[in-house]
């Protein structure tokens, strides 16, 4: 039996709700934030500290979930420079059309990410991304672990940044010399990763491999979950097969430390009331979604994020419009949902 959550008060639930309209951006989150071509991007840390290098980065929810959630908002032709992570990184195109490139110079592999698709780039693969659409776009990020570590940048990214007043320290602290900041006596600038170390660590993905790490909402694999109901469909995108949930493997079937599922509800459809043993985060992609938690109700609009209290009874419903959400759950093999009554 899943332990029941302390009955949440409305203020508790509001603290777990991140409205798209209330997102607090950081425009100097990373070493390349002033490099021409990358100087108009905004970084968001929704849940967890993420990998931002700026001490000014606002964190919306600090409660550990076992994974981190973030976001990036970029205008057309704005680039996030080549880098790699120590844990799994997946990102979902909520709006805009994106190109994701691999390789230290971005010339090894390429995949396009239209709105409503998701890509997961394995650890130690140099990756960068660019908004190639005509409007401002938003990427929603999922990073494995409570502490996803630090970003490793392609060597030329560090060199270019020096010309624009930003220096990354070995400690991970970002110094803005244009703002009058300076190094402490015991600090040293981060040197580019040695070539022999890159040769040993870096993983390479070409165009063919890149096609295998992208999944669209249409490719998500529907299954008869414990919370299925007429007009309510859950479908696997990230994660291995999970007999406890009767879930098939998603197209992206390797371990991430979390699973990602699409959840769609037709107008006036509703899920059964149920509990979950793991952290569960709901990101609304389209429509309007009502989430009832222990008798309280919250309405999500597109771009809103909500962290459901672990163990709390929850129910999802749509009213006049179809709702499509991206769901992130902790663990590679979440427990079966427990129906309430």
Residue ranges: model-predicted function:
Residues 75-78, 86-99, 103-104, 277-294:
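Glycine- and acidic-residue-biased ligand/ion/polar-headgroup-sensing regions
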Residues 80-82, 100-102, 109, 121, ...:
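Short beta-strand His + acidic residue motifs that chelate non-heme Fe in jelly-roll/DSBH
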Residues 1-65, 169-257:
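A short, N-terminal "cap"/entry segment at the start of jelly-roll beta-barrel domains
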Residues 2-11, 126-209, 313-341:
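Double-stranded beta-helix
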Residues 88, 104-122, 295-311:
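Short acidic-glycine-tyrosine-enriched beta hairpin
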Residues 49-57, 68-85, 243-248, 259-276, ...:
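Conserved short histidine dyad/triad with adjacent acidic residue
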Residues 68-70, 99-102, 108-111, 249, ...:
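Ligand-binding pocket scaffold of soluble enzyme catalytic domains
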């Amino acid at each position: 039996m899943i332990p029941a959550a302390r009955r949440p008060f409305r203020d508790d639930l509001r603290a777990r709700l991140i409205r798209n309209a209330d997102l607090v951006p950081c425009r100097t989150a990373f070493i390349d934030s002033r490099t021409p071509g990358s100087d108009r991007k905004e970084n968001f840390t929704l849940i967890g500290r993420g990998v931002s290098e700026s001490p000014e980065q606002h964190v919306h929810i600090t409660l550990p979930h076992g994974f981190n959630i973030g976001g990036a908002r970029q205008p057309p032709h704005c680039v996030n420079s080549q880098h790699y992570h120590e844990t799994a990184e997946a990102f979902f195109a909520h709006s805009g059309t994106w190109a994701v490139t691999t390789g230290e110079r971005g010339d090894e592999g390429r995949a396009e990410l239209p709105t409503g698709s998701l890509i997961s780039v394995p650890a130690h693969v140099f990756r960068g991304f660019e908004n190639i659409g005509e409007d401002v776009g938003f990427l929603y990020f999922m990073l494995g672990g409570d502490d996803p570590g630090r970003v490793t940048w392609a060597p030329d990214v560090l060199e270019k940044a020096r010309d624009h007043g930003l220096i990354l320290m070995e400690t991970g602290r970002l110094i803005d010399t244009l703002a009058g900041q300076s190094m402490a006596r015991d600090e040293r600038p981060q040197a580019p990763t040695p070539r022999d170390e890159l040769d040993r660590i870096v993983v390479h993905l070409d165009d063919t491999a890149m096609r295998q790490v992208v999944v669209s909402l249409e490719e998500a694999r529907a299954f008869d979950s414990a919370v299925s109901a007429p007009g309510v469909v859950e479908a696997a995108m990230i994660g291995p097969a999970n007999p406890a949930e009767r879930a098939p493997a998603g197209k992206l079937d390797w371990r991430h430390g979390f699973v990602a599922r699409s959840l769609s509800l037709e107008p006036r459809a509703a899920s059964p009331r149920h509990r979950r043993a793991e952290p569960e985060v709901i990101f609304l992609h389209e429509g309007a979604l009502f989430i009832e938690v222990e008798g309280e109700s919250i309405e999500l609009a597109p771009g809103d994020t909500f962290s459901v209290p672990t163990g709390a009874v929850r129910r999802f419903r749509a009213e006049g419009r179809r709702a499509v959400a991206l769901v992130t759950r902790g663990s590679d093999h979440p427990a079966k949902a427990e129906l309430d009554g």
